[in-house]
């Protein structure tokens, strides 16, 4: 919006810079942090790596930011995609890795975010973990949109965050 305003001549110089700095992050770019804040509601232990690696009973979630999760996945789960992860869970001795996105609209940057999440389920190919795309927002509206048609036809693990607990069980 700020860029468009500048192009129309409504904002200039310092004023435009201040507006751009004060502009909040898009909601979909905050999803990873918001998603991790959702974990305690699942009532699974969120544990550090040294405990996570040795856990073998029940469900646990690895504690850490996306870069730490990515590093763990690279070292332990044959992960080689150049993207951080939003969740690594362990169900008994089986690992689950996931990318979370909240899509607020169709088209543009939202399509790129959608494709980003699907990259994980399409490209990760290791018996060491199950890859999931955790997607919420407009893509679940039954329509002829590319997003809805894609998730309806894909035979991959794509789900809403609201179903994550059920999926892990």
Residue locations for each model-derived region?
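Domain-level recognition of nuclease-like catalytic cores that cleave nucleotide substrates
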Residues: 132-169
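Active-site beta-strand-loop-beta-strand hairpin of nuclease catalytic cores
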Residues: 80-97
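Active-site glycine- and acidic-residue-rich loops that bind
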Residues: 29, 77-79
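Glycine-rich, often proline-containing surface loops adjacent to acidic residues and nearby aromatics
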Residues: 10-17, 93-101
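Generic recognition of flexible, low-complexity loop/linker segments
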Residues: 74-76, 84-86, 121
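Catalytic cores of nucleic-acid endonucleases
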Residues: 102-146
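Surface-exposed cleft-lining segments at the edges of enzyme active sites
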Residues: 16-23, 58-76, 100-108
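Interdomain/boundary linker segments immediately adjacent to catalytic/signaling cores
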Residues: 1-58
